[in-house]
Design a protein with these regions (language model features):
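Bacterial Sec-dependent N-terminal signal peptides
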Residues: 2-43
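Ser/Thr/Gly/Pro-rich, low-complexity flexible regions
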Residues: 114-217
Length: 217
């Protein structure tokens, strides 16, 4: 009988210790034996694409980074030459206390637009003649546009900056596009007819060399 009581006591103690070891920890930085890390979240102040006339000083609106509700220092790479036309990319990065990083980018366009192009508004939807896929132009400054789906490729999520510096001349200046790829254009033409049409070749690692023609809708 004594042996039975001893056995039951040992079993009870073992079970109690086991339950103690299996206690679940659930705090803001730990779940069980796993450590929780909070990646930095970067929030841009102002627009992700900013256009300024050539010769205008550029002042960055800034960016805020947080991890688990606490501010995290931000490092900025890239520069803007406000006296040279072009499309510039600024990259912001932040690292949390565990060494994990996150980034965000801003595009800055420095432009010079002639009076005969400044009055143009090329905004609108243009259908590619090959497949009907839509490229959407949005004017953000005189002679400066964002173009979603510039290649007229179904299923794409690419946005670029296009310029109309004079008359009806158009182009995609060399830039890092929204998907991080180097992108530009060649063989561009725009005809201000009714409906308007334009053509260009997209220079991008994932695009071919075909001339792409679009008609305004």
């Amino acid at each position: 009988m004594k042996r039975k009581y001893v056995f039951l006591l040992i079993a009870f103690v073992t079970m109690a210790v086991s339950c103690s070891k299996d206690k679940i920890i659930n705090t803001h930085d730990r779940v069980g034996i796993s450590k929780v890390t909070y990646y930095p979240i970067l929030t841009l102040t102002g627009n992700s694409i900013i256009a300024i006339p050539n010769g205008t000083a550029y002042t960055d609106p800034g960016v805020k980074a947080e991890a688990a509700g606490a501010d995290v220092p931000v490092t900025t790479s890239g520069t803007v030459d406000a006296n040279t036309d072009g499309v510039y990319t600024l990259t912001y990065s932040a690292v949390n206390s565990d060494g994990y990083s996150a980034t965000a980018t801003r595009t800055v366009v420095v432009y010079t637009t002639a009076p005969d192009a400044a009055v143009n508004d090329l905004s609108g939807n243009y259908a590619r003649t090959l497949n009907g896929s839509i490229a959407t132009w949005t004017k953000i400054a005189p002679g400066v546009y964002t173009v979603f789906n510039p290649g007229g490729a179904p299923g794409t999520n690419l946005t670029v900056v296009a310029i109309n510096p004079s008359g009806f001349n158009i182009s995609i200046p060399e830039q890092i596009a929204s998907d991080g790829s180097p992108t530009s254009s060649t063989n561009e033409s725009y005809t201000n007819s009714n409906p308007a049409t334009y053509s260009w070749k997209i220079v991008n690692p994932t695009y071919g060399t075909a001339l792409r023609t679009f008609v305004k809708q």
